[in-house]
């Protein structure tokens, strides 16, 4: 069964190691066969992989596009271990990602890592907000005069 992919004008898609860019109008592609496929919006470049979760995503992306889990296995394991040390509460998400990798479904692991990125942003935002709170526990607002 063919995979149907609709592309917006000028949208890019990676099929295997080839980048395909659409022209000026919408297009529908039917792709048959086994190839790694990622839309432009699902790709994180090396320069964008600045957070631990995004680095995990980037390594999974390399595994998927290169079709070579072994070449990137050590980097993946090291990144996962470091993330778990820093945020043990992420275990349910990490577990799902690693289960997909173990079963060979790297595409689903990539999709599950989007949840990890969202979680990382949530806890980072919470920590930054917490750091800005006054040490006395107040919310920083002065009481209004009656």
Each predicted region: which residue ranges?
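Short, charged/polar N-terminal "headpieces" of proteins
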Residues: 1-28
């Amino acid at each position: 069964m063919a995979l149907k992919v609709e592309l917006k004008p000028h949208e890019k898609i990676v099929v295997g190691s080839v980048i395909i860019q659409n022209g000026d109008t919408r297009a529908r592609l039917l792709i048959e066969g086994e190839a790694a496929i990622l839309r432009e919006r699902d790709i994180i470049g090396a320069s964008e992989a600045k957070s631990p979760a995004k680095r995990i995503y980037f390594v999974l992306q390399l595994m998927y596009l290169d079709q070579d889990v072994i070449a990137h296995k050590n980097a993946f394991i090291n990144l996962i271990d470091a993330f778990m040390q820093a945020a043990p509460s992420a275990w349910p998400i990490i577990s799902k990602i690693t289960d997909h990798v173990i079963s060979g479904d790297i595409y689903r692991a990539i999709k599950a890592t989007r949840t990890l990125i969202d979680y990382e942003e949530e806890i980072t935002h919470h920590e930054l907000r917490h750091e800005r709170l006054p040490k006395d526990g107040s919310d920083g607002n002065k009481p209004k005069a009656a």
